A protein has these predicted regions:
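Conserved phosphate/ATP/ADP-binding segment of small-molecule kinases
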Residues: 155-244
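Conserved phosphate-binding/catalytic loop of the ribokinase/pfkB sugar-kinase fold
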Residues: 88, 98-136
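Substrate-binding N-lobe of the ribokinase-like
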Residues: 35-94
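Conserved phosphate-binding/catalytic region of the ribokinase-like
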Residues: 211-344
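Positively charged, low-complexity intrinsically disordered leader regions
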Residues: 1-29
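Short beta-strand scaffold segments in enzyme catalytic cores
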Residues: 52, 95-99, 237-241
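Hydrophobic anchor at the start of a short beta-strand
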Residues: 10, 60-62, 83-85, 172, ...
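Short acidic, glycine-rich surface-loop motifs adjacent to enzyme active sites
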Residues: 131-151
Length: 344
């Protein structure tokens, strides 16, 4: 890997990366033959997208990825070699297919993550710890789907990573979904978690129809030990919740082209702000030691920018739309997009 100097404030881990193949079509007709106007290909995965976004903003964030050794040219071919650290494992790289219609409608078909052997996963854990130590990183982002172990079919364990990061005084941000989201949410092992409204509703087992519902659901995660919950609410913007504070933020409406990767952009935006603007002596540390409201405001700006771009990874973080931060959210405000919490 090239382009890294010691001293990256953030390291990312994408446990199950994917080759994102996007077909651009005028209108998708189900059950018929459709012709693609164009096809794009990029190496993707939530942690990769976070690293790519931070890299664009001038924040070094090396990304660790266990990657199938059957496609050795993929890093160079997708222009990802500069900021990714591959750990070559047996097998192929999974493919995610996105069909993007002219009107902005997005259809996505994701392959299941490739299972890993215990040895391969242990090597991922070791490389993660080594990289965080060498970089002197303050944050580790674990993002995306989790693979399972080849022999048992159980999800790989993040506990050794959380234990090591806790030992090193490194903060962790976790963005995953499904059963692992529920499990690790209840463990309270991560410093920051970033569920969307549907995931949060599923996690607490009830519908979320107001901003207050979202905040009280997030407080359940705070109660388990999660320091900050960043809940993305689609058109309703985003809230950040700690045990003592809650903020909401949004931007003016933007023209939506592609929603895939918007959540990753918000997490990258949050982290770019908190590492670039550390709390100074005498300033409010919001009870956590980093500037959560600034991070939240930046998160919605980056997320709004991401949905106006055709790829799942950010291509630019210049000309950001204005962000509006609400220091006292209205708990009774109805969500434009209520969350039912039904599993997908």
């Amino acid at each position: 890997m090239s382009g890294h100097m010691n001293g990256s404030p953030i390291v990312t881990l994408t446990p199950a990366p994917t080759l994102d193949r996007t077909y651009f079509v005028s209108d998708l007709v189900s059950g018929a033959v459709n012709r693609a106007d164009n096809v794009g290909e990029e190496l993707a995965g939530k942690g990769i997208n976070v690293s790519r976004g931070l890299h664009l903003a001038g924040v070094s964030a090396p990304g660790i990825i266990p990657i199938g050794n059957s496609d050795p040219s993929v890093l160079v071919r997708t222009g990802s070699a500069e900021f990714l650290m591959p750990l070559w494992v047996d097998g192929t790289l999974r493919v995610s297919t996105t069909i993007l219609e002219k009107g902005g409608t997005t259809t996505k078909i994701n392959e299941t993550p490739r299972p890993l052997s215990h040895d391969d996963w242990n090597a991922v854990v070791e490389l993660t710890e080594k990289t965080v130590r060498e970089q002197g990183a303050k944050w580790l982002v674990i993002a995306g789907a989790l693979p399972t172990y080849k022999d048992s079919g159980e999800f790989v364990s993040l506990q050794p990573i959380f234990d090591k990061m806790h030992e090193l005084g490194v903060k962790t941000a976790l963005d995953t979904s499904g059963a692992p989201l529920g499990y690790w949410g209840r463990q309270g092992a991560a410093t920051v978690m970033k569920p969307n409204a549907e995931e949060l509703a599923f996690l607490v087992g009830r519908n979320l129809t107001t901003i207050g519902d979202v905040i009280s659901a997030a407080r359940e995660l705070n109660g388990h030990g999660v320091e900050v919950v960043l809940a993305s609410l689609g058109a309703d913007g985003m809230v950040a919740v700690t045990k003592d504070h809650a903020w909401s933020a949004r931007t003016a409406p933007v023209k939506v082209i592609n929603t895939v990767g918007a959540g990753d952009a918000t997490l990258a935006g949050f982290l770019s702000a908190v590492v670039s603007s550390p709390i100074q002596p005498g300033e409010d540390d919001f009870g956590v030691g980093y500037n959560v409201p600034l991070g939240l405001k930046t998160a919605v700006q980056w997320g709004a920018t991401a949905v106006t771009q055709p790829t799942s990874g950010l291509t630019s973080v210049s000309n950001l739309p204005e962000g509006f931060l609400n220091l006292n959210p209205d708990f009774n405000e109805l969500l434009d997009e209520p969350a039912t919490g039904k599993p997908h």
